[in-house]
Amino acid sequence: MVGCGSDDHGAGGGSFVADIRPAIEAVEAELGEGQQYFEVTANELVTNLFVAVDDATAAVPYVYLDGELQPPAPKLTGASGFTFSADAVDFDEETVLEPVREELPDSTVEAFSIEAGAGGVVRYVVSTLSPEGGRLDVTVAADGTVLEVDPL
């Protein structure tokens, strides 16, 4: 995935993480409340949502672009794994990226993902790119506290 850098290092309204909740709300407005998601990932360009269907054996990808939910992509069959609901999404969009940006000031935050875990819990992952080309996935708590770092 190619991400765009941003001069805006604040979170909240000026950051792409602020698009996640409206994107989920748009899917729920389109399909009904209580949808289950395999993953939601936002970057500077779009927010991608993978909605679980057919008893979580398939996923329907949606793109939220410029404040609008786009028509769904074709269903992806053979999906499996954990899912989560909108109620499980509890990150603080004002602070969730700040610890990573403070620890890696020269790196670009390329994406923020919400991934499903066992029991409907979620895992938040910040994907970064260093000026030297190294990539890290940084798992964070809802407030941005760094929990784990995985080099890619």
Please report, for each region that a protein language model flagged, where it lies by residue.
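Bacterial signal peptide processing site
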Residues: 4-8
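Low-complexity, compositionally biased segments
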Residues: 10, 93-95, 120
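A cross-kingdom feature marking solvent-exposed beta-strand/loop segments within repeated
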Residues: 10-39, 109-111, 146-148, 152
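Alpha-helix initiation/capping motif
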Residues: 16-19, 92, 141
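Exposed beta-strand-loop-beta-strand "reactive/processing" segments of non-cytosolic proteins
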Residues: 26-61, 114-140
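A short, surface-exposed beta-strand/turn
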Residues: 58-77, 134-152
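Long, charged/polar, surface-exposed segments that mediate recognition or autoinhibition
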Residues: 66-111
